[in-house]
Amino acid sequence: MSNVVVCALYKFVSLPHFESLREPLLSMMEQADIKGTLLLANEGINGTVAGSQAAIDALLAWLNNQNGLENIVYKLSFDDEMPFYRTKVKLKKEIVTMGVEGIDPLKVVGTYVKPQDWNALISDPEVILVDTRNDYEVQIGTFKNAINPVTETFREFPEYVKQNLDPAKHKKVAMFCTGGIRCEKSTAYLKEQGFEEVYHLEGGILKYLEEVKQEESLWEGECFVFDNRVAVDHDLKKGQYDQCNACRMPITEAEKLSPAYVQGVSCPHCIDKISDEQRKRFVERERQVNLAKSRNEAHIGSDVNQVIEARRQKKEALRQQSAEKNKAKQ
């Protein structure tokens, strides 16, 4: 049975003193052995974390006791292994970066559609269905007949709307994303641009996969997630994709057989994009990863120096203990 609980959460809420939440929140997470990243901004909180069921319950209870963070939106899934290496609480300008000033989902937002009502909406021929996620996410799974804006980051979405959508022509627009947060901003943006009927999937793809039976589902493929699972299937279990540690793109087992694939260094998606300097750095990082594995140590990217320092301190402690024992014998 999977014993690691993965919790994706967010809430748009005015947090004028969000900076003061960072230290107590980080302390709470570290004490509960919760790993992952939470973002705090003036507009709210967002992130995905993982830990034991008791730890996640404690985190949700802690957040519920903070002014403004009551009844936070969250979705749970499960994994056999911890999908994160670090514990972080970051202060940001936005909890999901669109880069457009004045977009406030607390003031105006699209119409929420429950997962059980989603199929009927997107089956309406008058509805334009838009996937608000990035291209690499869309490539491994999306809803039937959804439009892929082919964006590399969410910052590009407003330009896509400007070039491709027209409130006079597109009367009904439905949008979706992984957990719902990007749609909060994308629907708010469309409403600000004059679109009248704007809908979004409440709880995102993850909630849809949780509540809609596979035989009734209009979802095709797997859903990309921003942790070490890479993707989840319709049962919210780890999918078939791995991830290139160089470019972070999802890759299949077939792509790993390509000559362009070198573990931790390159894959078919990035082989022609990385510089010689990057390649050297990736080779060294992979060497350090393998070295850490051989010593049963956790390598966490750029934190390799911390691993080395921890090993040095351990050796120093053993040396001091040995010296004290020898001194006691004299």
UniProtKB/Swiss-Prot annotation:
Substrates-to-products reaction catalysed: uridine(34) in tRNA + AH2 + O2 = 5-hydroxyuridine(34) in tRNA + A + H2O
Boundaries of every Rhodanese domain copy: 123-217
PROSITE patterns per UniProt: RHODANESE_3
Catalytic site positions: 177 (cysteine persulfide intermediate)
Record EC number: 1.14.-.-
GO BP annotations, alphabetical order: tRNA modification
Top-level enzyme category: oxidoreductase
GO molecular function: oxidoreductase activity, acting on paired donors, with incorporation or reduction of molecular oxygen
NCBIfam families given in the database record: PRK00142.1-4
Family note: Belongs to the TrhO family.
Functional note: Catalyzes oxygen-dependent 5-hydroxyuridine (ho5U) modification at position 34 in tRNAs.
HAMAP family: TrhO (MF_00469)
Protein name: tRNA uridine(34) hydroxylase
Source organism: Shewanella sp. (strain ANA-3)
Gene that this polypeptide is encoded by: trhO
